[in-house]
Curated annotation (Swiss-Prot):
Pfam families: VirC1 (PF07015). This is Protein virC1. InterPro entries: DNA_Partitioning_ATPase (IPR050678), P-loop_NTPase (IPR027417), VirC1 (IPR009744). It comes from the Bacteria. CDD domains: ParAB_family (cd02042). Keywords: Crown gall tumor, Plasmid.
C-alpha cells in the first residue's frame, strides 16, 4: 500500500479538494483507496456522507478517522490488511507529532497551493518544514507542489510571478484548474460517479461536458503521481 499525504500549514490551501480529486481518478482506474481523515473537522467523513446520499460513493474506497495517533495506527493496520492499493492522508493545518508521523511514513508528499502571495509563502514554509523534517530523520521521500485553482485562461501578472517563485521546487506538471466541478465535489461526492450519473440525463449535457474535462485533468495528475511513486 502506497501512502500519499497532502500537507500544508495553511487552512484552505486545497488539501482536501486535491485529495478528493485524486481519489476519484484512482478509483475510476479500479484502484482501492483508503482515506485517512487526520483533520479533526473530519471533512472526508462528511464527504462520504454526502456522496452516499447522492449515490456517488465508490465502494472501492473507505474513510478512516485518523486525527489521533492511536486512530492513525489502527487505520493504517486495517487498510493494509484489507489490501488497499493506496492510502491518501488529509492532514490538519500546522505542525504536530501526528502530522510528522504521517509525513515520515509517506511514499509521496503533495503540497497544494493557490497562486496568491499568502498561499505561496505558506507553501514555501511547508516545503522547508517538510524537507528539514525528512533530513532530521534521514529520509528521502519525494515531495512536490500541486498548484490549485489555476485560471483556465491567462494568468494575471501577479499569478505569473507567484508561479515563477515555484520554479526552483519540484512541481506537479499539470495543475488543478479553477473549475466548478472541483468546488462542488464536497457536496456532490466522487467526481467520476457524478459524471456517470449525468451521462444518463440529456438535460445535463453541458454540465456533463464540464465534468468530463475536469475528470480528464484529474486522470492526468494521477498518472503523474503514479510516475513519481515509481521513481
Amino acid at each position: 500500500m502506497k501512502l500519499l499525504t497532502f500537507c500544508s500549514f495553511k487552512g484552505g490551501a486545497g488539501k482536501t479538494t486535491a485529495l478528493m480529486g485524486l481519489c476519484a481518478a484512482l478509483a475510476s482506474d479500479g484502484r482501492r483507496v483508503a482515506l485517512f481523515d487526520a483533520d479533526e473537522n473530519r471533512p472526508l467523513t462528511r464527504w462520504k456522507e454526502n456522496a452516499l446520499r447522492s449515490n456517488t460513493w465508490d465502494s472501492f474506497c473507505e474513510v478512516y478517522a485518523a486525527e489521533e495517533m492511536s486512530l492513525l495506527e489502527a487505520a493504517y493496520e486495517d487498510a493494509e490488511l484489507q489490501g488497499f492499493d493506496y492510502a491518501l492522508a488529509d492532514t490538519h493545518g500546522g505542525s504536530s507529532e501526528l502530522n510528522n508521523t504521517i509525513i515520515a511514513s509517506s511514499n509521496l508528499l503533495l503540497i497544494p497551493t493557490m497562486l496568491t502571495p499568502l498561499d505561496i509563502d505558506e507553501a514555501l514554509s511547508t516545503y522547508r518544514y517538510v524537507i528539514e523534517l525528512l533530513l532530521s530523520e534521514n529520509l528521502a521521500i519525494p515531495t512536490a507542489v500541486l498548484r490549485q485553482r489555476v485560471p483556465v485562461g491567462r494568468l494575471t501578472t501577479s499569478q505569473r510571478a507567484m508561479s515563477d517563485m515555484l520554479a526552483s521546487l519540484p512541481v506537479v506538471q499539470s495543475p488543478m484548474h479553477e473549475r466548478d466541478a472541483f468546488a462542488a465535489m464536497k457536496e456532490r461526492g466522487m467526481l467520476h460517479l457524478t459524471l456517470l450519473n449525468m451521462r444518463t440525463d440529456p438535460s445535463m449535457r453541458l454540465l456533463e461536458r464540464n465534468l468530463r474535462i475536469a475528470m480528464e485533468e484529474l486522470v492526468t495528475i494521477s498518472k503523474l503521481v503514479g510516475e513519481a511513486l515509481e521513481r
